[in-house]
């Protein structure tokens, strides 16, 4: 997404690894030499401290997102994965109403399931009154999903 960072963890870990990345849309990539960032500049300027602080914050956010994704993927069935993800989004929005951050195709990819199987499961969940879905808008009926 906009303002995103990739490869930072590899740089910090000292990994000498190549990786392949595909952007979903046009973007600019800025290469920043890790060693240059981590060494204090001679003036110990505030800009340098801000860059380091922002980099650490971005890495913490990435770590949290990866942890959340792993938690969702740890569930066995498509229904369990969907409910885990929906409960997480509901908790973040502090509401049973939330908007999916991406398309249903990307949702299927995110939870590592077949799209048609996921859509079938969503239809079953809708029929059982667990969720109400209108495109990307979701209402999770919490009293039925606990």
Residue ranges and their predicted role:
Residues 18-19, 39-48, 65-74, 92-95:
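Short helix-to-loop capping/linker segments positioned immediately adjacent to catalytic or ligand/cofactor-binding
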């Amino acid at each position: 997404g906009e303002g995103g960072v990739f490869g930072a963890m590899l740089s910090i870990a000292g990994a000498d690894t190549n990786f392949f990345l595909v952007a979903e849309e046009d973007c600019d990539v800025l290469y920043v030499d890790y060693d240059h960032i981590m060494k204090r500049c001679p003036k110990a300027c505030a800009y340098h401290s801000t860059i380091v602080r922002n980099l650490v914050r971005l890495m913490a956010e990435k770590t949290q997102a990866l942890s959340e994704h792993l938690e969702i993927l740890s569930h066995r069935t498509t229904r369990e994965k969907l409910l885990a993800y929906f409960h997480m989004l509901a908790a973040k929005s502090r509401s049973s109403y939330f908007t999916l951050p991406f398309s249903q195709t990307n949702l299927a990819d995110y939870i590592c399931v077949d799209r048609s199987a996921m859509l079938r499961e969503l239809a079953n969940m809708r029929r059982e009154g667990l969720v109400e879905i209108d495109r990307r808008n979701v209402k999770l009926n919490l009293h039925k999903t606990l």
